[in-house]
Amino acid sequence: MPKMKTRKAVASKFRVTATGKLKASRPGRRHKLTGKTPKRKRQLRRPGLVDDGHLKTYKRLMCL
């Protein structure tokens, strides 16, 4: 059976932590920023962890 190819689009959006979880940048920080509070924009800078419901799918696409 051949090797699975990594989905490069998925691999470019996520980073793997030391414990095997996935980190990704948060959505909502590209445009329409005038309606958001400074606190909300500041918190959107930090990357978030992928929830358990999607973790298995993304890991399979990244061949982990």
UniProtKB/Swiss-Prot annotation:
SUPFAM superfamilies: L35p-like. One of its GO terms (cellular component) is cytosolic large ribosomal subunit. Signal peptide: none annotated. Residues 23-44 have a biased composition (Basic residues). Keywords: Ribonucleoprotein, Ribosomal protein. GO terms for molecular function: structural constituent of ribosome. Residues 19-44 are annotated as: Disordered. InterPro entries: Ribosomal_bL35 (IPR001706), Ribosomal_bL35-like (IPR021137), Ribosomal_bL35_sf (IPR037229). GO terms for biological process: translation. It holds the Pfam family Ribosomal_L35p. Belongs to the bacterial ribosomal protein bL35 family. HAMAP family: Ribosomal_bL35. This is Large ribosomal subunit protein bL35. It comes from Protochlamydia amoebophila (strain UWE25).
